[in-house]
């Protein structure tokens, strides 16, 4: 970000280190072209399922949505996440291990602001989502990018992580299924990475936002489900945006060590106060209500993948690794 000379003393100088979102910039450019089909922002193109809409409307009409909630979220919202983890993650969590936020992106922000001290390093496998690095910089940390290769299906190895580790390494960011590659780490790969993190006392930031969107028989394994030791090192970030087509509603959550969760809630309390109340009631319905619409959308994404992948692979000069999850194609 370039700061004009006449205004430079009016801005926080750390802004100069932030790049902004190139995806948003590209989206603005694409929006200016008449008749273009935009495949820019990472969101489903389905409307939010009606039962979820109705839950929010009901909360608005009967007055429940009119007021603040606890900063970390309604007790009912936390219980919905507890039940969701028991069903989809296979282990039991307590409400004090949950904090709900205004989107998974804000959950990530409060995590980095809670654990990163000036000079701490966070390892980020690339290709990656653009916001991890800038959020770490905002916490005065140092993002350390480790390049995953196309030959290894865009997945990093323990050997690569160890080569990047220093005495300042504090966090490993792990996004599986991946944005933008769509690749999924196997349970064996995750166990090796998790044990490495435990051995070196490195926190794992597990961005699981695409965990329900997997295709063609592939399976998502949460790294936090593999052992108690790995679970203690892991903060899981998830939300309702991708699986339930709720990107505009803005609700994400974090699950993990109660002390880290409490610190994240403290930051949220001084910034957003609480996640939007009506959205929380919508999210409760999303997480605990019928899941058939999730499967309908997943099948639609799978059909699109299986249609476009072979066509794109035929384009001269394009090399594409077939995604296993999320909803992106990442051609070379």
Where are the predicted features?
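Helix C-cap/helix->beta junction micro-motif
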Residues: 33, 139, 199-200, 230
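Conserved PLP-anchoring active-site segment centered on the Schiff-base-forming lysine
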Residues: 114-136
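Conserved glycine-rich beta-strand-loop-beta hairpin in the small C-terminal domain of fold type I
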Residues: 284, 299-309, 320-332
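Active-site PLP attachment segment
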Residues: 226-263, 278
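Active-site phosphate-binding strand-loop segment of PLP-dependent enzymes
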Residues: 149-218
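N-terminal small-domain helix-loop-helix segment of the aminotransferase-like
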Residues: 2-7, 11-103, 110, 286-289
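Structural signature of PLP-dependent enzymes
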Residues: 264-268, 287-310
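Structural motif of enzymes handling amino- and sulfur-group chemistry
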Residues: 258, 275-291, 296-297
